[in-house]
UniProtKB/Swiss-Prot annotation:
SUPFAM superfamilies: Molybdenum cofactor biosynthesis protein C, MoaC (SSF55040). This is Cyclic pyranopterin monophosphate synthase. Gene3D superfamilies: Molybdopterin cofactor biosynthesis C (MoaC) domain (3.30.70.640). It comes from Geotalea uraniireducens (strain Rf4). It is an enzyme of class 4 (lyase). Keywords: Lyase, Molybdenum cofactor biosynthesis.
Length: 160
């Protein structure tokens, strides 16, 4: 098995994608935040002391997608054409499913941008709620979907 993030001497490199043709790339990723149900209800009712938790988390996730190459060393800087963050809440369990979608017309995929976006949005929910709920967890960070490029379409089993 060869690893394309290393040169012949075993040194880390950023993969050369200059010879690839740009194509439309889309990726969707998710992270799940678990809070106490009463904390989630306070978020939904707009009663959190730090303000609009989901609004701020949405903006943080979008900004994070654009900052991915600054956080992931071998990630390519990309001209992102679309970034969105959505939330699905379950008041009974206290779960927030954070879903990030990123799109670009590029030579390499946007999976890392979607993963970073969902993760940072989830971390922002944590940051804004940690004062009132010490038991918050974040998990199930996963790529749900990707398309574009020679590898074609990937859809996570749970999404099929």
């Amino acid at each position: 098995m060869s690893f394309n993030h290393f040169d012949e001497q075993g040194q880390a490199i950023m993969v050369d994608v200059s010879g690839k043709e740009p194509t439309l790339r889309t990726a969707r990723a998710q992270a799940v935040v678990r809070l106490r149900p009463e904390t989630l209800q306070a978020i939904l009712d707009g009663r959190m002391t730090k303000g609009d938790v989901l609004g701020v988390a949405r903006l943080a996730g979008i900004a994070a997608a654009k900052k991915t190459p600054e956080l992931i060393p071998l990630s390519h800087p990309l001209a992102i054409h679309h970034a969105a963050v959505e939330f699905a809440t379950d008041p009974e369990t206290g779960e927030i499913a954070v879903t990030a979608t990123v799109r670009a017309f590029e030579r390499t995929g946007v999976e890392m941008e979607a993963m970073v976006s969902a993760s940072v949005a989830a971390l922002t929910v944590y940051d804004m709620c940690k004062g009132s709920d010490k038991g918050i967890t974040i998990g199930q960070v996963a790529l749900l979907y990707k398309e574009g490029g020679k590898s074609g379409v990937y859809r996570r089993e749970e999404e099929r």
